[in-house]
UniProtKB/Swiss-Prot annotation:
It comes from Burkholderia pseudomallei (strain K96243). Residues 143-388 form the Radical SAM core domain. Its cofactor is [4Fe-4S] cluster. Its main location: cytoplasm. It is an enzyme of class 2 (transferase). HAMAP family: MTTase_RimO (MF_01865). GO terms for molecular function: 4 iron, 4 sulfur cluster binding; aspartic acid methylthiotransferase activity; metal ion binding; protein methylthiotransferase activity. This is Ribosomal protein uS12 methylthiotransferase RimO. It comes from the Bacteria. Residues 11-126 form the MTTase N-terminal domain.
Amino acid sequence: MKSSGKPLAAPKVGMVSLGCPKALVDSEQIITQLRAEGYEISGTYDGADLVVVNTCGFIDEAVQESLDAIGEALAENGKVIVTGCLGAKKSASGSGLIAEVHPKVLAVTGPHAVGEVMQAVHSHLPKPHDPFVDLVPAAGIKLTPRHYAYLKISEGCNHRCSFCIIPSMRGELVSRPVAEVMLEAENLFKSGVKELLVISQDTSAYGVDVKYRTGFWNGRPLKTRMTELVGALGELAAQYGAWVRLHYVYPYPHVDEIIPMMAQGPLKGHVLPYLDVPFQHAHPEVLKRMKRPANAERVLERVQKWREICPDLTIRSTFIAGFPGETDAQFETLLDFIREAELDRVGCFAYSPVEGASANALDGALPDDVREARRARFMEVAEEVSAARIARKVGKTLKVLIDEVNAEGGIGRTAADAPEIDGVVYVEPAAKASKRYKVGEFVSVKITGADGHDLWGEV
């Protein structure tokens, strides 16, 4: 059979990605597989033959946002496959929530289900056949800017926090093989990534499910454990002049082993002095009802010890105010903890019942206005603490990774600032050509000003 000479148009798939960075990585993996098989990615509904919507189902607002996004995709395109956490959520009747609200979707899967998503895509939009073209770089397709990327090291969680339903949606902890993680990290650095953000549901638990099994990387043994993984990632980052940033670090004892890497030796400046630790509360009774580790005094001692070892350490955390049964005195204990721990970056949610969470059955539910008032008061205190710590940086010269360049100068981040969630540095335009900077470059910036959240500086 003779060829017509015209290449067949590749089928196009649209992608809508909602939720946390872990869901973003799932979306990246789906897009990578689509491109590997020859599909094109469409940035518009009307330019796509089919749309995949990756959902979030953690809190009620996220559920509604996901349902709205599915509805919009159905209205604008008509052919929709749904994946993500909301896909695992049941309705009050016990059936799948998405199928009940949007019965016209083509298929529904749960989270981290690339294979199932691809099967659904194949069923409704057969893949093209072009074995002569490799469309995908080794680093995969990323939705983040080229100079930073998320590295997911595990999926699922073994905790059973009373306010959370993530384990019921994402399952028990499953750690990725250490060699697979290291290979992905190496490919990302080779592709030009300057900042690697390590994520999971519980980074500290990496390897627990496989009893810290020893794997191999570049011919040498490497234990499937957070400490050893961070050390290896730091060594790799040093080869490429890059950063490694740790997120979702539960305060297990072996976290203490990471702090010296941040403070001294060859990994200093590559394993960033930054910990994202979800403390959630500080009063032992509230923590007990949350089914969280309940030794707040010990946590405070450890935070202070970490800072003795690594004075530049930045600690980010999240908290819940107005949890069922929280008394005025218990809330004041939380505020005292924030002041004493001097946390750098803090987020706080007013407690909100989540369908399926065991906390819904607890006594002592607080009125909406009390919960919101406590959240607002918490943030007032947290912002005072944060502003005081940020002000200490004025006059210092800091290493900044440039995220954006425009007519007014540049916008970048220091080691203390993760993308999207922390502050930024507004950098004045370079006065000399020799000092001009580009996106993805590290520059030395003298800090000239600060507000409660961001910094200003000049090269």
